[in-house]
Amino acid sequence: MTKREKIISCIQEGRGVLGIEFGSTRIKAVLIDENHNPIAAGDHEWENRLENGVWTYRLEEIWEGLQDSYAKLAEDVKNTYQIQLTRLGAIGFSGMMHGYMAFDREEKLLVPFRTWRNTMTEEAAAVLSECFAFNIPQRWSIAHLYQAILKGEEHVEKIDYLSTLAGYIHWKLTEQRVVGIGEASGMFPIDSAAGDYDAEMMQKFDALVADKGFPWKLREILPKVLRAGKMAGTLTKEGARLLDRSGCLQPGVPLCPPEGDAGTGMTATKSVEKRTGNVSAGTSVFAMIVLEKPLSAMHREIDMVTTPAGDPVAMVHCNNCTSDLNAWVGLFAEFAECFDIKADKNTLFSTLYQKAMEGDKDCGGMIACNYYSGEPVTGLEEGRPMFLRRPDSHLGLANFMRSHLYASLATLKIGLDILLKEEDVKIDSITGHGGLFKTKGVGQSILAAAMNAPISVMETAGEGGAWGMALLAAYMLSKKDGQSLGDYLDSRVFAERKSETMEPDLADVAGFETYTKQYQACLAAEKAAVQAF
């Protein structure tokens, strides 16, 4: 049987596994075969909007995006293999973690979806962090809930279910109110040993709001927590229609627990074991390090989440990464079009990224402050993208692009230095993935300089979270009894896959250190810009 015939047989017999991830600018669907290789894909571009001071996506945009990405994947199957996609072996959904989707008993959304990007919960996050003696970031679901309580928002007493984006989609397609443990860890603190929400902190929260007289206790409105590998329901008839507008997809497909983009990133990079880590760099950027032991102190810059299997993870999350860089690349594309030069997006990015490597190691006196939105790691409530240079700086394209690439990781470096230098966390391997690493060697070398550590990029780096989600669904479907997620990934998924590792260049490391000090000094100007403009 040829490779193509095997794939056709896999699809026709319903052994293909589907992963769909809702990123902040793209919804991607990936179908994999029994060897965990992508065999079809579809995607849909979308953008959050700022409405009444809230970063949000509308419900109709969520469903339109889901249906379009699935339809494109089904079309890819039809065009490539000349068959109709009607059956699946398993499905998994993932999305941007955190945020706030509150529903009443009639399953109606009570307020517009508040995404992770909002930095409106400072008071709630501070009170809860002190109450729990545990860092509660502003974007966590519990911070959004408590902020709504502090503001006296009327909808709170009507809440019947509080979910995330991935949890919402899973619920609508299966009627199951569940999330994976990694996704849950971005809603409320987790007790890794119990594999559930931290019971003591939950009691503290209920006591904190007891005088409000709400008709619910916190556990009653949060989704049930499941570790990777558990079955989390099946696709209902209504769910199948919601996913596939053509009506071809058969219901009854098993679904794994929905996970967050952090968990799918760990899975896609084989970073679920202790002393491993990964950096996901796109619109936002985060680094996750699986810990050997708890941190010695609470750090407001460090979030504690878990792997999809429930092991503790230290996470540095920054709201801003490549948005400003992407905007400048868009400007250069527009400039090229004035001269009737049509460059495709990939060529444009790779050309400009490669150009950056010719720049001065410290960017020659240029600083890009890339804050589109607020940045809790550095204490900014709002952002104003800004480019600064000294009069004696060398203004050239290479330094300009290099400064924007450095900026995309500078805030991450500020947070990571706490883990590496203050907490003395040990890391054996770091894997990079996401859009920043698509151009060979560039994002990888910049991250190696930022962390002063070797960075690996896998041949699957461009697959990203949707592929990681498909792997989690495949793990549920195909694991042996008692087989851990780490062992499954090692033996079944990554044994044959290649990766390239790049050691840090010492001159780059020194240049990035200089740049980061200047970047931190320029945050005073950024704060002033927020006030003035």
Residues covered by each model-derived region:
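A general alpha-helical scaffold signature found inside nucleotide-binding enzyme cores
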Residues: 57, 61-65, 143, 442, ...
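Active-site core segments that coordinate phosphate-bearing ligands/cofactors
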Residues: 2-12, 18-19, 85, 123-139, ...
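N-terminal glycine/serine-rich phosphate-binding loop of ATP-dependent small-molecule kinases
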Residues: 1-111, 126-127, 158, 219, ...
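Carbohydrate-associated surface elements
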Residues: 118
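Short N-terminal micro-motifs specific to bacterial/archaeal maturation
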Residues: 53, 113, 136-139
